[in-house]
């Protein structure tokens, strides 16, 4: 059940994690540990009612989890998207059931299971797209929504990342070059980045280990 407090103060807030593919453990752990940036951001939400964090379909602790284990032997080929898809389908997993519409329906089912009249939504990044889908499909479920960093449903955001990154870097380099202090500290920032890209292309290195 949601918080028993009366009026709007008792409406639970459902956190819509971004990604897509982000899990809730990091957020919950950070809040519990008292990380300042999280307590500052979520303190007002926690003060008014319950904060519900969940793992969306296929990620985090939800089952089945859509992931393929990485080989322990670094020389072995990493599983491609195609082979991972085929492996999951062999397990009888219907991948068509993992999308924003189904995630939105899960939130509706969660609201019903909680036995509350209304829910608040807090979405960041992909969570904003999910929030918009919930508002579209179940507007009567929602009392209020915080949409932080809109990911419109009609914009192919993932495919725009390379172009967006190039634009951001170009503007950063131009701004640094136009600033006397920055240009003196980081001369030819654009050229240095190009050299770094060429170096990493020739001699890449592993930054993290993922399972």
Located regions from the model:
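Gly/Pro-rich cap/lid or specificity-loop segments adjacent to the active site
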Residues: 1-210
């Amino acid at each position: 059940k949601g918080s028993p407090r009366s009026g709007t103060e008792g409406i639970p807030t459902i956190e819509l994690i971004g990604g897509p593919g982000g899990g809730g453990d990091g957020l919950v752990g950070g809040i519990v540990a008292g990380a300042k940036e999280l307590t500052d951001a979520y303190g007002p939400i926690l003060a008014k009612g319950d904060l519900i964090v969940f793992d969306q379909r296929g990620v985090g602790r939800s089952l089945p989890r859509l992931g393929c284990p990485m080989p322990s032997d670094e020389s072995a080929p990493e599983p491609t998207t195609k082979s991972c898809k085929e492996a999951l389908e062999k397990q009888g997993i219907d991948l068509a059931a993992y999308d924003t519409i189904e995630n939105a329906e899960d939130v509706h089912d969660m609201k019903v299971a909680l036995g509350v009249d209304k829910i608040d939504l807090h979405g960041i990044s992909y969570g904003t797209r999910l929030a918009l889908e919930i508002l579209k499909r179940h507007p009567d479920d929602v009392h209020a929504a915080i949409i932080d960093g809109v990911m419109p449903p009609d914009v192919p955001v993932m495919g725009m990342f390379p172009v967006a990154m190039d634009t951001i870097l170009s503007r950063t380099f131009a701004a640094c070059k136009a600033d006397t202090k920055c240009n003196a500290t980081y001369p030819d920032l654009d050229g240095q980045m190009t050299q770094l890209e060429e170096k990493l292309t020739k001699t890449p290195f592993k930054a993290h280990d993922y399972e």
